[in-house]
Design a protein with these regions (language model features):
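ATP/NTP phosphate-donor binding region
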Residues: 2, 6-84, 208, 321, ...
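Glycine-rich beta-strand-to-loop/alpha-helix junction loops that act as flexible
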Residues: 33, 87-89, 112-114
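Short Gly/Thr/Asp-enriched flexible loops that form oxyanion-binding sites at enzyme active sites
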Residues: 91-104
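Glycine-rich phosphate/pyrophosphate-binding beta-alpha loops
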Residues: 161, 165, 218-231, 297
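Gly/Ser/Thr-rich active-site loops/lids in small-molecule metabolic enzymes
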Residues: 176-184, 233-253
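ATP/nucleoside-binding phosphotransfer catalytic cores, i.e., glycine-rich phosphate-binding loops
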Residues: 205, 211, 236, 246-327
Length: 327
């Protein structure tokens, strides 16, 4: 299928193809060709065949630069696609959701995780296996999920944060992530340890205030942050609340101790950690504090975050829905 602003994408038709009586649904695959060590491109023909068999007339767009997936997703909304599939990491998913979030009528969203960390996919149990991820889209169920909006014009699907440590994910070059995967983050983290410092911040959350020095703050929508799934263990993807985690000022020995607790999910009762849930959060500082938005550079404070409850309809595994229902 070809179209304005579309990359060529061979669509495979069944025997009765375009003459079938039931109209086909329309899907748009938006993929980052550099994610996942460029594996997705090689699997594209079989993905298209699966989508066709499931009743989707499918077109593709390979992103070429930052912000490209936003425009591709906007195109999908304006041309009334039924489904948009994000293929890439958390940054690609963020751009796809950002492209559709402002519209009153939005297509459903599917995800094929091909990034380095894939926090959202981890949170809802979408596997990295391409064929299994496609099966979730065509055989699974969609549920409404929360997203966040920052300063009324930028969106987050998984995490926002500030502090030197949160700069790690967007300081690692894309080529290094392609070659080394998650190891690239560990190496960069070790390199950054000597430069970790606190900043004075004022954080207002649902009528409460934190006004003190902090090493970092994290505003989350899921339980997975940087690949660690125990930082916000009770996070829910559709309860209308962010999790807010503030790591207060501490020395390096204390930092290492709290970090080891966090790996085991035992950090929430530590006096150096403030952990709450809130639907609206405002953060200001007299210092220059950089922001991380779903693993990418998100600007500089001040910032206000608002939870848009159940705003996006996403396909997730049936097992995740059953697990969620049991809680």
């Amino acid at each position: 299928v070809y179209g304005n602003f579309l990359q060529p994408c061979h669509v495979l038709f069944l025997e009765n193809g375009p003459e079938r009586l039931n109209p086909m649904k329309r899907a748009r695959i938006i993929y980052n060709p550099t994610s996942g060590r460029e594996l997705f491109r090689r699997h594209l023909p079989e993905v298209l065949q699966k989508m066709e068999i499931a009743g989707y007339e499918t077109s593709c767009h390979a992103t070429t630069c930052e912000g490209d997936a936003v425009k591709a997703a906007e195109y999908a909304v304006e041309h009334k696609f039924d489904l948009v599939v994000a293929v890439g990491g958390d940054g690609t998913l963020n751009e796809v959701v950002s492209g559709i979030a402002k519209y009153p009528e939005r297509p459903k969203v599917g995800l094929i995780p091909m990034g380095t960390t894939n926090d959202f996919a981890r949170a809802v149990r979408i596997p990295r296996d391409i064929n299994r991820a496609v099966d979730i889209i065509i055989k699974g169920e969609s549920i409404p999920v929360d997203i966040g909006v920052m300063n009324d014009d930028r969106y987050l699907v998984n995490i926002a944060g500030g502090g030197r440590l949160t700069e790690l994910t967007y300081e690692v070059p894309s080529k290094l992530k392609t070659v080394l995967g998650q190891l690239a983050y560990y190496l960069k983290g070790i390199e950054m340890i000597p430069s970790i410092r606190s900043s004075r911040v004022r954080i207002e959350y649902d009528g409460q205030v934190f006004d003190d020095k902090a090493m970092m703050f994290l505003i989350g929508l899921t339980n997975s942050v940087g690949g660690f799934e125990k930082l916000a263990p009770d996070a829910s993807i559709n309860d209308g609340k962010f999790t807010l985690l503030i790591l207060k000022e501490l020395n390096m020995a204390e930092f290492i101790r709290v970090a080891s607790l966090a790996l085991r999910g035992e950090h929430l009762s530590d006096p150096h950690v403030l952990y709450v849930k809130a639907s609206k959060i405002s953060v200001t500082s007299n210092e220059r504090v950089l922001l991380n938005l779903d693993g990418e550079f998100g600007g500089i404070l001040p910032a206000t975050f608002e939870n848009l409850e159940r705003h996006i309809e996403m396909f997730v595994p049936l097992e995740y829905i059953k697990e969620k229902d049991r809680k």
